[in-house]
């Protein structure tokens, strides 16, 4: 009889255990603990590096990540560079395939098909956003699900919503790991997720509200989702009662100190480039008024240096999952046996 393997551990996805879940969170603090996403990401990348070393030492092929980058968007080029640097850091080989913004949708689909069928490619992602003439949803669904390290394919999204094993989207998984590794309890807690995007807000809500005893980790929280049509005063009515607020709307200063109760944990996923009124230089800001909110919150993530580094780290973990083919049908059967 085969030795039982913890399925969540095999996927690198772990859940809170009931004995570690605390029911207290909102005790007043003088100032928030600023969670360093960079520090947590270094820890995860170290784990990934060790996992790759063990995998290769066992005689397996080194994991390989292919990134398709379309156009000349400076932010996209910067993000892709960060991803390939992280891959090199953990021992994953990678390539960036550059294509002009004039590429047709058919040509891009043909390229993805070739990469899907390339046995040397373990993980595959197409950097978003894409030019307006290309259907992003069609492109995301063209990537084969077990190579879909972004976790955007409809099959991976569907499996995640059904609490089944799937390739988790990197940013939501990064938010989950921040909460879990920081020790912020979620069992029975009130959570507000500001933002309902299919790649960020919705998956974060799914991870936080589902049953922690199921295949895929869940936080057992009571989750409220707001969006662009939620009036600010109505949003405040929800956030003022929330133990955890996750801001993922892409609206600078959406969450202010008067909207947060004492001792709440605040995770800022938003990232917007604005011009500093004093220096006239551009800088990155989140959705949260950091200076004001940190005086009331118990935990808070900064922008930059919070969720961003975690997104890249979780992408590396997904590439390893893809290389080990843990989401192939036969592997899934073994995990659930």
From Swiss-Prot:
Although its dehydrogenase activity is NAD-specific, it can also utilize NADP at a reduced efficiency. Its EC number is 1.5.1.15, 3.5.4.9. Its cofactor is Mg(2+). SUPFAM superfamilies: Aminoacid dehydrogenase-like, N-terminal domain, NAD(P)-binding Rossmann-fold domains. One of its GO terms (molecular function) is methenyltetrahydrofolate cyclohydrolase activity. It comes from Gallus gallus (Chicken). This is Bifunctional methylenetetrahydrofolate dehydrogenase/cyclohydrolase, mitochondrial. Substrate binds at residues 79-83, 126-128, 304-308. It catalyses: (6R)-5,10-methylene-5,6,7,8-tetrahydrofolate + NAD(+) = (6R)-5,10-methenyltetrahydrofolate + NADH; (6R)-5,10-methenyltetrahydrofolate + H2O = (6R)-10-formyltetrahydrofolate + H(+). It holds the Pfam family THF_DHG_CYH. Signal peptide: none annotated. One of its GO terms (cellular component) is mitochondrion. Keywords: Hydrolase, Magnesium, Mitochondrion, Multifunctional enzyme, NAD, NADP, One-carbon metabolism, Oxidoreductase, Transit peptide. It is found in: Mitochondrion. InterPro entries: Aminoacid_DH-like_N_sf (IPR046346), NAD(P)-bd_dom_sf (IPR036291), THF_DH/CycHdrlase (IPR000672), THF_DH/CycHdrlase_cat_dom (IPR020630), THF_DH/CycHdrlase_CS (IPR020867), THF_DH/CycHdrlase_NAD-bd_dom (IPR020631). Belongs to the tetrahydrofolate dehydrogenase/cyclohydrolase family. It comes from the Eukaryota. GO terms for biological process: tetrahydrofolate interconversion. Gene3D superfamilies: Leucine Dehydrogenase, chain A, domain 1, NAD(P)-binding Rossmann-like Domain. Residues 1-30 form a transit peptide. PANTHER family: BIFUNCTIONAL METHYLENETETRAHYDROFOLATE DEHYDROGENASE_CYCLOHYDROLASE, MITOCHONDRIAL (PTHR48099:SF15), C-1-TETRAHYDROFOLATE SYNTHASE, CYTOPLASMIC-RELATED (PTHR48099). NAD(+) binds at residues 195-197, 228. Coiled coil: none annotated.
């Amino acid at each position: 009889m085969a030795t039982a393997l913890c399925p969540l551990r095999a996927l690198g996805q772990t859940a809170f255990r009931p004995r570690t879940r605390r029911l207290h969170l909102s005790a007043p603090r003088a100032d928030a603990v600023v969670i360093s996403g960079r520090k947590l990401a270094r820890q995860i990348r170290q784990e990934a590096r060790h996992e790759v070393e063990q995998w290769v030492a066992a005689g397996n092929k080194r994991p390989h990540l292919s990134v398709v980058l379309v156009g000349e968007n400076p932010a996209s080029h910067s993000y892709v560079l960060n991803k390939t640097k992280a891959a090199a850091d953990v021992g994953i080989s990678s390539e960036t395939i550059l294509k002009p913004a004039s590429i047709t949708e058919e040509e891009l689909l043909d390229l993805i098909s070739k990469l899907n069928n390339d046995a040397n490619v373990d993980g595959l992602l197409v950097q978003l956003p894409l030019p307006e003439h290309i259907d992003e949803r069609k492109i995301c669904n063209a990537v084969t699900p077990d190579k879909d390290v972004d976790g955007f394919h409809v099959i991976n999204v569907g499996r995640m919503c059904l609490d089944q094993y799937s390739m988790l989207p990197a940013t939501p998984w990064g938010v989950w790991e921040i909460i879990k590794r920081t020790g912020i309890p979620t069992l029975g807690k009130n959570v507000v997720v500001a933002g309902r995007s299919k790649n960020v807000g919705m998956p974060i809500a799914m991870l936080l509200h589902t049953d922690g005893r199921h295949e895929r980790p869940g936080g057992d929280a009571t989750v409220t989702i707001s969006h662009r049509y939620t009036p600010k005063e109505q949003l405040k009515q929800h956030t003022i009662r929330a133990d955890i607020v996750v801001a993922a709307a892409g609206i600078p200063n959406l969450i202010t100190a008067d909207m947060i109760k004492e001792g709440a944990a605040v995770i800022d996923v938003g990232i917007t480039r604005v011009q500093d009124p004093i220096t006239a230089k551009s800088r990155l800001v989140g959705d949260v008024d950091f200076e004001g909110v940190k005086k009331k919150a118990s935990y808070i993530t900064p922008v930059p240096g919070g969720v961003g580094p975690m997104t890249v780290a979780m992408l590396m973990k997904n590439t390893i999952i893809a290389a080990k083919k843990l989401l192939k049908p036969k592997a899934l059967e073994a995990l659930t046996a």
